[in-house]
Amino acid sequence: MNVNVPVPSTLADPLVIAGRTFSSRLFLGTAGYPNQKVFLDALEASGSEMATASIRRMSLEGYEESLADLLTGRVHILPNTAGCQTAKDAILTAELAREALETDWVKLEVIGDRELLYPNVEELLKATEELVNRGFVVLPYCNDDPVTCQKLADLGAATVMPLGSMIGTGLGIANPHMIELICARSPVPVVLDAGIGTASDAAQAMELGCAAVLLNTAVSKAHDPVRMARAFRYAVEGGRLARLAGRIPKKLHAEASSPEFGLVGS
């Protein structure tokens, strides 16, 4: 199977999700920062135009202002259903977010195991179908399975968001081949979500064909979150540039870049 994802010939290719345009392909989570100032500085350094937060935490983060107030006017707010284990709970949480934040967008998370934080595919599919029918723009967090991603897209998901590895582990992309397959087959943008540890992981995701990267812990728990946010900004841009440029083929044998003409003794 040819897994090469067609790419535009120029960099003038802003990301479009459900009719909304983003110039940044880095999305940022909001949890776990040392304080409000560090969070806001990291957000600015990242260049991100969309930030995600659990609806349960929107007014409980401990900042001087609620997260909703902090984010409004700065970025597009993407509420998520973190912690939900059933489609019913996720749908209810999404409805609460829509009422509180006046947005139809939701990052859908339905977890099957509280220790592994791995998606419950059956409940995720049910929730996606129902939320799409209710007019939501659904961005589902899912496993790195091309079949599941295709089903989510068929149900009307605006993106698919496969994990690189388990949430918060920092292990990077455990199965790059599967991520590349998903990118090759998906009719909607692929956003890598979870497991990112450092900037090179984000660059790899973009080189594999992902449309964007969403991360949280890799920045919020870094020794210097602001500097790490800036590193991720450049990594995503660099990875996207590399994808657009097109890497050279891999070969089993050496191939000299200099011509043989003019060699001494030739």
From Swiss-Prot:
Keywords: Cytoplasm, Schiff base, Thiamine biosynthesis, Transferase. CDD domains: ThiG. Pfam families: ThiG (PF05690). The lineage of its organism: Bacteria, Pseudomonadati, Pseudomonadota, Alphaproteobacteria, Hyphomicrobiales. GO terms for cellular component: cytoplasm. It is found in: Cytoplasm. The active site is at K107. 1-deoxy-D-xylulose 5-phosphate binds at G168, A194, G195, N216, T217. It catalyses: [ThiS sulfur-carrier protein]-C-terminal-Gly-aminoethanethioate + 2-iminoacetate + 1-deoxy-D-xylulose 5-phosphate = [ThiS sulfur-carrier protein]-C-terminal Gly-Gly + 2-[(2R,5Z)-2-carboxy-4-methylthiazol-5(2H)-ylidene]ethyl phosphate + 2 H2O + H(+). Pathway: Cofactor biosynthesis; thiamine diphosphate biosynthesis. Homotetramer. Forms heterodimers with either ThiH or ThiS. GO terms for biological process: thiamine diphosphate biosynthetic process. Catalyzes the rearrangement of 1-deoxy-D-xylulose 5-phosphate (DXP) to produce the thiazole phosphate moiety of thiamine. Sulfur is provided by the thiocarboxylate moiety of the carrier protein ThiS. In vitro, sulfur can be provided by H(2)S. It comes from Azorhizobium caulinodans (strain ATCC 43989 / DSM 5975 / JCM 20966 / LMG 6465 / NBRC 14845 / NCIMB 13405 / ORS 571). Its main location: cytoplasm. Its EC number is 2.8.1.10. SUPFAM superfamilies: ThiG-like (SSF110399). This is Thiazole synthase. Signal peptide: none annotated. It comes from the Bacteria.
